[in-house]
Amino acid sequence: DLLLYRKLFLSRSDKFEDQYEGTFSEPTFEEIRKLSINNPAFLDYYKSHRENVVISSWHINEYESFAMWQIFTQKSEGLAIQSTVGRIQEALHLDKTFEQHIGEVNYIDYKKEYIPFDNTFFPFLFKRKSFQYEREIRIITDVTSFDLKIDNGLKIDVDINQLIEKIYIHPKSENWYKNLVIELVQRLGFDFKIEKSDLESDILI
């Protein structure tokens, strides 16, 4: 879909599997609750805000992650895009409608640690420590001011050639799948480097 339509999908934050997505830790929630005693709209805003924030999640790492292949792909078919923060920033300049923000996720203890709320993006840059393996960096867009009805997410224009540095193919994929990906990419007029993941390369013993 990304290659065919040259648009990047950002998922509505409250549709993520993690029910804590975009919420506050206990210490922060207690402070917000006190502040909202005389102003209920203050708390209501944060509850509804999640519906207007969309996110694209990326894994930041020097090396491939076997766990990420296992969790986010089905069977032996799937692709991983290699990029850099700089390339992502440049690629997003193509979209003139929405403003995107890029930030690295912090992993904290939601029962003990505090999440700042002086910026409306902060709740979306924190997750529970049990998600540390994701090493996530995010593209975040707030569409509140656009008065849009978003179902599952939003597609934004993106410079594909700038975004994608290399494509990795699932380590357990068959040759026919690799050839199919190469043919599709060529037909669409792209010349990305395409490699099969070496996580399943031949052992040396």
Q: What role is predicted for each listed range?
A:
Residues 1-205:
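Partner-binding and oligomerization surfaces adjacent to conserved cores of proteins
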